[in-house]
Regions:
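Flavin-dependent oxidoreductase catalytic cores
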Residues: 1-408
């Protein structure tokens, strides 16, 4: 038997997990009408039953203006009972329950969130596509308080941990990055100024979390394109988050509106993506320009590890969570042996919810995810799913596209 930390318990703040695995907060797209569903419960229960230490419900908006999708959770009192059903189901399977809280900022559209999208600065977001209004200085305290209110709702719903989304080009990330923050006040310009909104959010979060909820923060190590944040700045962000009270950092990267495949790696199956789209003009536009809008970034297992190791060297005070392209027991053990306290997975557990249990039995266990990104291509319109487990037959043209990508 290899020397492995994988199935040893470890703690994040007040929370102890039964092992080192966490289902990452990959968007499920299972909440039509912005409310929890039986499908969401069934999926997270299956992952918990599959042996994971904690499973994380993804991308819950702290305000209506922060919604990117009409199948995304929106935190408000009326959804607490539905969320409580989910946390109860997760706990019965022996896993902890986490929820990711965030605000999409400019990554929305009036048809989804009901207002002109807001962000760190005014401009035009080609991703949506839509004009964006920069948040006024006097609006920022209320926006920060929305995070704190959402933490309190998460506690009522029985969650053990919250993960604050400060990466991937969403609202906090939009304030941090010089690419999206063009403000002339004390919230723009220098890195110190660009961190002010994050500090404000974390103050509200930590006050609401108190001593009984674990607080993780997902952050970028790099934005993934020229003109975005690089490690010299993000290392300072990580150190500030430690000062702000974060109890673990999830080390990621990428910017959904500018470098989406830097987050996920591989190639987006454009034909599949547009097949599921409802909006005719968006379907046509993505079909014509998708390869340019969503350029491929080569996939390799543990693709963020080289950068993450730099943070492991500098950040000693709190646990670091590695996320990014893990599909085998061998690579997971390697990452843990590098000193990371936890690992996160999403696509591996979508492909095989019981993967963690299988790893307990097999030292050479490897899931069957082939990195076609079919699950992500459909996620923008309908629920996230692995094409290997569909009940319906895929159209021949989509099968051909997926098979081609899986051979790369």
């Amino acid at each position: 038997m290899i020397d492995s930390k994988l199935f040893t318990p470890a703690s994040i703040g007040p929370l102890t997990l039964r092992n080192r695995t966490i289902r990452s907060a990959a968007f499920e797209s299972m909440c039509p009408g912005n409310v929890p569903s039986q499908q969401l419960l069934d999926y997270h229960r299956s992952v918990a039953a599959g042996g994971v230490g904690m499973t994380t419900i993804a991308y819950a908006a702290v305000a209506q203006s922060g919604l990117s999708f009409d199948r995304q959770l929106w935190m408000r009192p009326e959804i607490v009972p539905g969320l409580k059903d989910i946390t109860d189901a997760i706990h019965k399977e022996g896993a902890a329950a986490g929820i990711q809280l965030g605000d999409c900022g400019n990554m929305s559209h009036k048809s989804i969130c009901g207002v002109t999208p807001v962000g760190a600065s005014s401009g035009f977001n080609l991703y949506s596509p839509t004009f964006v209004r920069g948040l006024r200085k006097d609006e920022l305290p209320a926006m920060a308080k929305a995070y704190g209110r959402s933490v309190n709702l998460a506690r009522e719903a029985g969650f053990d941990a919250v993960e604050i989304h400060a990466g991937h080009g969403y609202l906090i990330s939009q304030f941090l990055s010089p690419y999206t923050n063009h403000r002339k006040d004390e919230y723009g310009g220098s890195l110190e100024n660009r961190m002010r909104f994050m500090d404000m959010v974390m103050e509200e979060v930590m006050q609401a979390a108190g001593s009984d909820m674990a607080v993780l923060v997902k952050m970028n190590m790099r934005d993934g394109f020229k003109g975005g944040m690089e490690i010299d700045e993000t290392m300072q962000v990580a150190k500030r988050l430690v000062q702000d009270g974060a109890q673990a950092l999830v080390l990621s990267g990428g910017f959904v509106s500018k470098a989406p495949m830097y987050v996920m790696r591989g190639e987006m199956p454009i034909k599949t993506m547009t097949h599921y789209m409802n909006c005719w003009w968006l379907k046509y536009g993505v079909r014509m320009a998708g390869k340019w809008m969503i350029p491929a970034v080569p996939f390799k297992e543990a693709y963020f590890l080289e950068d993450a190791l730099k943070f492991r060297t500098e950040i000693k005070d709190i646990p670091l969570v590695y996320v990014g392209g893990l599909v085998s027991r061998e690579k997971i053990d390697e990452v843990l042996n590098h000193g990371f306290e936890f690992v996160q997975m999403a696509r591996a557990l979508l492909n095989e919810p019981g993967f963690v249990n299988r790893m307990r039995e097999e030292e050479k266990a490897r899931c069957n995810c082939k990195h076609s990104n079919y699950c992500i291509a459909r996620m923008y319109t309908i629920e996230m799913a692995c094409h290997q487990h569909l009940r319906e037959e895929l159209p021949a043209s989509l099968k051909k596209e997926i098979e081609k990508l899986e051979k790369k």
